[in-house]
Amino acid sequence: MDQETVGNVVLLAIVTLISVVQNGFFAHKVEHESRTQNGRSFQRTGTLAFERVYTANQNCVDAYPTFLAVLWSAGLLCSQVPAAFAGLMYLFVRQKYFVGYLGERTQSTPGYIFGKRIILFLFLMSVAGIFNYYLIFFFGSDFENYIKTISTTISPLLLIP
């Protein structure tokens, strides 16, 4: 693979690998809580603390394929840097959601809502990239620079709660 190709996906790969480490952390928390309750064997039922850890992990796992799909689509079809930034923000929010879910369930709500907004942003970046492709294909008009400028400008607004 040549350097230019790697340069176009390296940030997305870094965010993906960080998300894998985060998934490992969540799985470790579930395993630790399970062993605390049941000794050596893994059980899907247990105390309230285990149920919360297990449910928080399961909710994060359920949203993970969607996150990866829109992260890579937005990064490849639109712009890598804002997509990677949004991906890092999503991982931070997912951590906040996970930790918040272990406490009071109302503490997880801000992370959940913020995560939905980031997924929507990545989805819209992907749609803009696809739309630009078809504009080039059918009309010969390339709006890639405008789309990259807009997405780069809007991505810091994801920090606003």
Swiss-Prot record:
Gene3D superfamilies: Membrane associated eicosanoid/glutathione metabolism-like domain. Its main location: nucleus. This is Arachidonate 5-lipoxygenase-activating protein. Changing A27V: Strongly decreased affinity for the inhibitor MK-591. Required for leukotriene biosynthesis by ALOX5 (5-lipoxygenase). Anchors ALOX5 to the membrane. Binds arachidonic acid, and could play an essential role in the transfer of arachidonic acid to ALOX5. Binds to MK-886, a compound that blocks the biosynthesis of leukotrienes. Residues 1-8, 78-80, 129-161 are lumenal. InterPro entries: 5_LipOase_AP (IPR001446), FLAP/GST2/LTC4S_CS (IPR018295), MAPEG (IPR050997), MAPEG-like_dom_sf (IPR023352), Membr-assoc_MAPEG (IPR001129). It is found in: Nucleus membrane; Endoplasmic reticulum membrane. Homotrimer. Interacts with LTC4S and ALOX5. It comes from the Eukaryota. It is linked to Ischemic stroke: A stroke is an acute neurologic event leading to death of neural tissue of the brain and resulting in loss of motor, sensory and/or cognitive function. Ischemic strokes, resulting from vascular occlusion, is considered to be a highly complex disease consisting of a group of heterogeneous disorders with multiple genetic and environmental risk factors. Genetic variations in ALOX5AP may be associated with susceptibility to myocardial infarction. Involvement in myocardial infarction is however unclear: according to some authors, a 4-SNP haplotype in ALOX5AP confers risk of myocardial infarction, while according to other ALOX5AP is not implicated in this condition. Residues 31-52, 103-107 are cytoplasmic. The C-terminal part after residue 140 is mostly unstructured. One of its GO terms (cellular component) is nuclear envelope. The keyword Chloroplast does not apply. Pfam families: MAPEG. Residues 108-115 dip into the membrane without crossing it. It is a multi-pass membrane protein. Belongs to the MAPEG family. Changing V30A: Strongly decreased affinity for the inhibitor MK-591.
